Amino acid sequence: MYRDKELIIRPILEADLSELWSLIYSEELPEWKKWDAPYFEHKHVTYQDYLKTKDALVNQDNRWVIEVNGEIIGTIGYYWEHKPSNWLEIGIVIYKPAYWSGGYGTRAIRILINHLFTTMPLVRVGYTTWSGNERMIKVGEKLGMTMEARLRKCRYYNGEYYDSIRMGLLREEWESNPQFK
């Protein structure tokens, strides 16, 4: 568990599953999905089926909840793109619109990046977003990340093409960036 004032990121507990299911699956077209890879279908999962995945969610090192003042507002985590070369990517979703543009995502990502570079022999941490999610691009810029790739017009959503964006931070950039201290 890590804390930055009222914001906490911590492993998912079994007691969190009902709230997480509600945030992710209770609505057919949730507002958050308009920003989190909306070009991929959001498939409804019943609560019973969601509970069948609890072993992959509860107390895992790679997927945590984000809390503000004790309220779960999102999830954050990482996945291996290519483990033999220590290449991982991070992901975040703030499910509750009331918490968008409040700096919570930036702070949570900063905490996770610190955790990853401190506990793993990584040379790079990155994430992929799309040009329709300008807030996520700005988060990376605020954290000193580099736009490493812009794959033009490869994401299609609501009748428009968007770019896929890759942001990355190298260990030496993390070490020299005072906001990570």
What are these regions (language model features)?
Residues 29-52:
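Conserved GNAT-fold acetyl-CoA-binding loop/helix
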Residues 1-19, 26-27, 63, 67-181:
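Acyl-donor (CoA/ACP) binding surface of acyl/acetyltransferases
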Residues 54-59, 145:
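Short loop/turn motifs at secondary-structure junctions and domain boundaries
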Residues 21, 51-54, 113:
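A generic alpha-helix structural signal
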